[in-house]
Amino acid sequence: MERHCLFFVIFSLILHLVQAQDPIGFINLDCGLSIQGSPYKESSTGLTYTSDDGFVQSGKIGKITKELESLYKKPERTLRYFPDGVRNCFSLNVTRGTKYLIKPTFLYGNYDGRNVIPDFDLYIGPNMWITVNTDNTIKEILHVSKSNTLQVCLVKTGTSIPYINTLELRPLADDIYTNESGSLNYLFRVYYSNLKGYIEYPDDVHDRIWKQILPYQDWQILTTNLQINVSNDYDLPQRVMKTAVTPIKASTTTMEFPWNLEPPTSQFYLFLHFAELQSLQANETREFNVVLNGNVTFKSYSPKFLEMQTVYSTAPKQCDGGKCLLQLVKTSRSTLPPLINAMEAYTVLDFPQIETNVDEVIAIKNIQSTYGLSKTTWQGDPCVPKKFLWDGLNCNNSDDSTPPIITSLNLSSSGLTGIIVLTIQNLANLQELDLSNNNLSGGVPEFLADMKSLLVINLSGNNLSGVVPQKLIEKKMLKLNIEGNPKLNCTVESCVNKDEEGGRQIKSMTIPIVASIGSVVAFTVALMIFCVVRKNNPSNDEAPTSCMLPADSRSSEPTIVTKNKKFTYAEVLTMTNNFQKILGKGGFGIVYYGSVNGTEQVAVKMLSHSSAQGYKQFKAEVELLLRVHHKNLVGLVGYCEEGDKLALIYEYMANGDLDEHMSGKRGGSILNWGTRLKIALEAAQGLEYLHNGCKPLMVHRDVKTTNILLNEHFDTKLADFGLSRSFPIEGETHVSTVVAGTIGYLDPEYYRTNWLTEKSDVYSFGVVLLVMITNQPVIDQNREKRHIAEWVGGMLTKGDIKSITDPNLLGDYNSGSVWKAVELAMSCMNPSSMTRPTMSQVVFELKECLASESSREVSMTFGTEVAPMAR
């Protein structure tokens, strides 16, 4: 290890000394050059080239064929090719805010003997630059670096293998090649001469390559041996400016220079370089207008004798159909025709993808370096573009105007050794950290408790020792797993936190848990005991068990097995008074008001013949509700199954559904914050029961505001179980199923994988909670952030809870409880289902929110009492 470090220091010193001999800031990489052959001075330019070995972590070395070597310069004879991975990147240290001319060279040279030129893409950082599909080409771009590290990436787009021969960077002055936005991609750079050949460094101090153009037949080349004053920052070579082209006949009025743009809609910048090479007599004048696409861009211009001037537009231009025409048009007072020495054109490339937060990039690279991680995908920008996201990372980049942030780091089973490094705390937005199944030693660092966004920490399967920091144990909404660390001291006493009432909340350190979950665990255990007792003593209760749901309840039998609570169609007609009063309409059909025996009010949902829901879902809902009973699940009074006449008969919910109240469709008073929290809590309890109280567990699959019903006392009941699914195998964590649900509420992970878990309901509930907080539509096509979660996420960056809270509440709420509810909703909607809370945890947190709001209301009531007047 020491030998490697010493070698790196020596190599760095050599590189520094070598580069000091070149113009300041020049980077010259000979890709594929061995360390032993580095550095060397290229004979024609005098520039010093070094191996690319320290600038890229992947790739193999190749050489062009022997017969071609004599035709090319030494840097172009070797190459680096990338058979492995999709994106392979060079990482270069640069100066942030500096404009660079970036020049990679690609000379295939049949290095692989296949004689097939590869096709691949080139990226600058996270943004696509250009496709490389030709042999012996140099690509150029003028680009301002947004950080102190510049990454040039080769991306495989098919079966062919990307390669590169040289990579060169040249810093430029800020006040040349100015543009409004974006980067400038090389289109052409020409000068006019009778002598063939290119002009480059050292003639051009910026190492631009100038291509010679022969004049047209009716044009001539002017030359001079005198020195040209080229000190206008563009610093064109003397050889370029000592020649110019002009019409042979003085009477010629116009010089034309056509070219085509690809794609035709491209914007471009044009830079024209002039210097008068003839000493004009007193009676001679050279004056002309610069006309681009028929528009005069510079009027009555006269080049100065032996002094270079550059004419350019400050705004980008476009050409009709991509066909461009530059004209130099002689003015009426001019005695001589126009002339021009050189011109350049660059197309505008907008790079819309913002690089990942600089501090977090530095942090993750330090982590990579410290642990010696050599993951194939860990190259380029960690988060963007999304298709190249680093393995083990999740990022939040929903807002295009702000840098992406790292939200999850999974280094499980990565062979990590040593301690948990302090650098991790610089990932300030990290929500999930998984360092499990490594060989980490030392203690559990206290800084983990100070990371405000952190919700999940998995340190299981390591060799950690010492005591778990109390701050970490006491942190709320944190899942902590330290299982499999035999040297770690976490006794029951050290892992206990006292609640406000002096009760003990045991936090199991061997499974992921949420802070302050004791009461919910107790409730769940009590419920299970209750269910077992009732199962073992069926004679104690005539009703079916409210906890056990048979595994075959989703059988494909043609009729419903249970005959209890079955009504005839004639009875349905009677109870609805021939379907007199409509309560609502949905995808299932029409819902009518009715009464049983003239006393019990009911809602009768008739299955439409055109319903997409169908008999299967009708049957599923009946069999579920006949067996499952909970105060927060809508009660099934009965059903009708008579030929094609299918009806579900529910208990009547006088106050309709939550959506009607949030949208104002129902009229009446606005639901205050306390009532909303009560509704959310009761709906959550209904879901918690489906997930934990039923065996096998049930997943609702269609949790939304229209399926949350309210009775006359605003008690809440979850409804519409037609899409519900059970997990028939005990211990099964998911089922694979066709995606079903409502757009906007649908779990993206479930949609993507077809794997249904109870966490899919948790996601949907998070959406419901955001709707209750904000009173915003779930999907709004007129909103920049169309989905409610994106909109809330963007607003939260401002730190003002009022900006997202329903204005109808008029600020009448405890801001702490609103913040807690928002945080809970966002955690429910975490992209990774593993990091979402369970419904038990959601219930507990909502109870705390409601308690906080209730105590505020009580204190306000006391605060309005008349106080005694001072005497």
UniProtKB/Swiss-Prot annotation:
Q: Which residues lie on this side of the membrane: Cytoplasmic?
A: 534-871
Chain ranges on the Extracellular side, renumbered to this chain: 21-512
User: Start-end of the LRR repeats?
Assistant: 405-426, 429-449, 453-474
Q: Domain named Protein kinase: which ranges?
A: 577-850
Q: Which residues form the signal peptide?
A: 1-20
Catalytic activities = L-seryl-[protein] + ATP = O-phospho-L-seryl-[protein] + ADP + H(+); L-threonyl-[protein] + ATP = O-phospho-L-threonyl-[protein] + ADP + H(+)
Mark the residues carrying the PTM Phosphoserine. S736
CC terms in the record's Gene Ontology section: membrane
Where is the protein localized? Membrane
State the source organism's domain of life: Eukaryota
PANTHER family listed in its UniProt record: LEUCINE-RICH REPEAT PROTEIN KINASE FAMILY PROTEIN, OS07G0107800 PROTEIN-RELATED
- The entry's protein name is Probable LRR receptor-like serine/threonine-protein kinase At1g51810
The uppermost taxa in this organism's lineage are: Eukaryota, Viridiplantae, Streptophyta, Embryophyta, Tracheophyta
